[in-house]
């Protein structure tokens, strides 16, 4: 056992030289604790037995300033040493390896000034001196300067002076201290912040019910507070909540007004409510029947109703009278027993883009018009065979008289040829298209139309002399080997395109190669046989009544006196663009379908003369120029 020397001047360098009693039954922990205390420059007294520590305290309590004791001791409980230390008015620090809540709470309740957990750190031991100062404030106050020593609270001094031998204070002193504390609390209550009111859902429902009962205009905080009758709620709380509630209602009203304002055109002008619905086409078709000429002038536009220009609705395109401006003239033509061909407009053409036709109310509206002048069906020369068939461009379909769509019909032949077509066609070479494996009748089509889908050509012409399996593809045959259903051409119907806005039939220059690709020269015998078959016309008078001009395509059973030479045309393929010189002459008696008194200046004669001049001057005439087309596609 070691005892630190006590000196009268120990407070001069406090906490250096503070006397500490260390008690622990574990020698390792005790040695570690001693080293740390010495590093703090404390005077250390250590022991491993609690009984010896008690004897030292009882002999001279003024020998130590602080006691550090382990809780668990083998001979005596650590709390027993704590009680003795408190009797001697010494600060006691409990040391233990257990850091649980119950152990710490037990040590603090029994009077320990601090509770340290093993292993103890250096910083913790450096701050244990303030416990000594708390117990001896009067003695350690002398260490302070005179100015600071006077500022020590008087209450602490009184309490320290009136401490009796047992360490208890008088009851009167406690009452005085309680009264002073209550007065201080009362003085601070005026400056204390008021508790905040939390508006729960139930409290807000009572508030809303009170406002609805009074009315929003007459609701004031005092009346609302009386109706709510809730303790702890002040008038200021109700006033603040009422202001927030009114702002909330104002925002809701503004949001509803914004939703009701039209914003389709990026503006809030209420005048857009007065706009009519997009239903102009119904009024357009019901107001006036479109004239058959296919052209609307300004006088026609002024008679139409105004809603036509204000809006356009695609639902108004159901009426067939808006599209088919010439359908009512020749739609009732019937097939005669002599084999008259019919050409009519489709009543089901609906997919037409009308926005391009109605760009301005002051511009004349042009509607589709079928315009074709066809001359007499006579025996023509080689030039008519080479050029007139391509210029006619009459698409022959099945017996169906309607098209599903003008823009999607695969059999519709369009052209950019703007001159009236007075050229007659002759010598059309048909071909048979089909597959050998198909047991049905082969499909019959004209040359140049083979690039189009052939689903609507089925059933037009049936062959009786050739079985389907024995005919190769694109095989040329003679007209006398083909029979038509009903021994006439009454069942065959030609369709006229209503797609051209200019009113004239057009043909795509890209179709030239397709038309002329398969018009290969046959043997002299085959051409002569074909020409011979044309001498006796078995079909009688063939007419092509067109709805726009009522021009008739006739054959007056005139005989063909001129034969066709086998050198009529050279083979044309994708790499050749020239046609050989024809060897036959034109029929001088060829006339157009006009009356005799109107034949002084025939357009057909002018066209044929121009073609002869070009052939004589150039020798070899390009295909595109030969047939009346430019060598490049029109813009």
From Swiss-Prot:
Composition bias, Acidic residues: 166-186
Record localization: Nucleus
Region annotated Disordered, chain positions: 144-196, 323-342
SMART domains linked to this entry: REC
Expression (tissue specificity): Predominantly expressed in young leaf tissue developing anthers, and siliques.
Function as written in the Swiss-Prot or TrEMBL entry: Transcriptional activator that binds specifically to the DNA sequence 5'-[AG]GATT-3'. Functions as a response regulator involved in His-to-Asp phosphorelay signal transduction system. Phosphorylation of the Asp residue in the receiver domain activates the ability of the protein to promote the transcription of target genes. Could directly activate some type-A response regulators in response to cytokinins.
Name of this protein: Two-component response regulator ARR18
Organism: Arabidopsis thaliana (Mouse-ear cress)
């Amino acid at each position: 056992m070691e005892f630190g020397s006590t000196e009268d001047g120990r407070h001069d360098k406090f906490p250096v030289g503070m006397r500490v009693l260390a008690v622990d039954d574990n020698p390792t922990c005790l040695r570690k604790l001693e080293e740390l205390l010495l590093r703090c420059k404390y005077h250390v007294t250590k022991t491993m037995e609690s009984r010896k520590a008690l004897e030292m305290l009882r002999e001279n309590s003024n020998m130590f300033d602080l006691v550090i004791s382990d809780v668990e001791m083998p001979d005596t409980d650590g709390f027993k040493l704590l009680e003795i230390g408190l009797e001697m008015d010494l600060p006691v620090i409990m040391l233990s390896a257990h850091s649980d809540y119950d152990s710490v709470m037990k040590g603090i309740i029994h009077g320990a000034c601090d509770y340290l957990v093993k292993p103890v750190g250096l910083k913790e031991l450096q701050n244990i001196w303030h416990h000594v100062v708390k117990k001896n404030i009067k003695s350690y106050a002398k260490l302070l300067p005179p100015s600071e020593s006077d500022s020590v609270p008087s209450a602490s001094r009184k309490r320290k002076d009136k401490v009796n031998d047992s360490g208890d204070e008088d009851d009167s002193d406690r009452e005085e201290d309680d009264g002073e504390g209550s007065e201080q609390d009362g003085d601070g209550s005026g400056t204390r912040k008021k508790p905040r009111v939390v508006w729960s859902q139930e409290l807000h429902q009572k508030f809303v019910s009170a406002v609805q009962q009074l009315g929003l205009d007459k609701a004031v905080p005092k009346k609302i507070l009386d109706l709510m009758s809730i303790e702890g709620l002040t008038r200021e709380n109700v006033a603040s909540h009422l202001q927030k509630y009114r702002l909330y209602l104002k925002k809701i009203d503004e949001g509803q007004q914004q939703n009701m304002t039209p914003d389709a055109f990026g503006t809030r002008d209420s005048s857009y409510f007065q706009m009519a619905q997009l239903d102009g086409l119904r009024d357009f078709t019901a107001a006036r029947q479109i004239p058959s000429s296919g052209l609307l002038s300004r006088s026609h536009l002024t008679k139409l109703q105004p809603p036509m220009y204000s809006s356009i609705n695609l639902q108004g395109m159901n009426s067939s009278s808006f599209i088919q401006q010439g359908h009512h003239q020749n739609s009732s033509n019937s097939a005669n027993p002599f084999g008259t061909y019919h050409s009519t407009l489709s009543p089901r053409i609906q997919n037409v883009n009308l926005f391009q036709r109605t760009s301005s109310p002051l511009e004349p509206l042009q509607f589709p018009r079928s315009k074709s002048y066809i001359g007499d069906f006579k025996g023509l020369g080689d030039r008519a065979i080479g050029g007139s068939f391509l210029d006619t461009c009459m698409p022959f379909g099945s017996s169906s008289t309607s098209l599903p769509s003008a823009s999607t019909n695969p059999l519709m032949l369009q052209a950019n040829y703007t001159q009236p077509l007075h050229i007659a066609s002759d010598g059309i070479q048909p071909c048979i298209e089909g597959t050998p494996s198909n047991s049905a009748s082969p499909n019959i089509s004209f040359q140049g139309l083979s690039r189009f889908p052939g689903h609507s050509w089925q059933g037009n012409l049936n062959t009786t002399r050739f079985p389907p399996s024995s005919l190769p593809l694109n095989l040329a045959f003679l007209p006398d080997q083909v029979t038509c259903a009903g021994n006439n051409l009454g069942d065959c119907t030609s369709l006229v395109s209503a797609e051209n806005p200019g009113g004239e039939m057009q043909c795509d220059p890209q179709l030239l190669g397709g038309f002329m690709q398969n018009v290969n020269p046959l043997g002299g015998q085959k051409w002569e046989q074909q020409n011979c078959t044309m001498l006796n016309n078995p079909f009688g008078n063939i007419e092509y009544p067109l709805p726009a001009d009522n021009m008739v395509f006739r054959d007056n059973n005139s005989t063909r006196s001129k034969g066709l030479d086998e050198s009529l045309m050279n083979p044309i393929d994708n790499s050749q663009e020239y046609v050989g010189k024809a060897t036959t002459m034109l029929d001088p008696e060829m006339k157009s379908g006009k009356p005799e008194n109107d034949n002084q200046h025939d357009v057909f004669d002018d066209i044929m003369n121009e073609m002869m001049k070009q052939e004589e001057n150039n020798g070899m005439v390009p295909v595109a120029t030969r047939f009346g087309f430019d060598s490049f596609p029109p813009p």
